[in-house]
């Protein structure tokens, strides 16, 4: 039987205020999120760190073009990357936390090895992404007309924060589709040739 493990530490918080207080956010941190998530839940807290809104760099699935645009505004070294959002946010943040994040094409071509630069804290805001506990980042490589996944232990988040407040306000359409996504992940685990009694 193969080992079943979850790498990131998982913590649950009652609300966003408790999460922020426990994390001790400083000016060295960088938050990557969506404006529609940040404004109602965090804006009034006047956090001391820079905040980048993913939708300002492109829409839809994460792409190499979106990441390059994002990288231009996230160039300085950061103490921690805090990713608050769905799969797109989490996949982009995994790359932002790398030392060699400016080598996206080489990383996805297998010509460069990912190296972690700083801790990554993943805060999922949908029910089914699963990306918060994996070592995979998927990007659409626009120049090559393909979509690829990069899997390496350097991409594991260091901590996952579960904050129910962030899922409560999810529009019904997103709640329904992300719940189906979670159900599909469960079925995949059960039907996998590598399934175990635990999975």
Task: Annotate the PLM regions.
Residues 84, 90-103:
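DPxDG-like acidic metal-binding loop motif
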Residues 101-197:
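A glycine/threonine-rich phosphate-anchoring loop and its flanking beta-alpha core
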Residues 39-40, 88-94, 130-133:
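Short glycine/serine/threonine-rich phosphate/pyrophosphate-binding segments
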Residues 70, 92-97, 186-187:
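Buried hydrophobic packing segments
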Residues 44-47, 96-99, 134-138:
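Short, glycine/charged-enriched secondary-structure capping and boundary segments
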Residues 1-80:
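ATP/NTP phosphate-donor binding region
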Residues 32-33, 84, 123:
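Short hydrophobic segments within beta-strands
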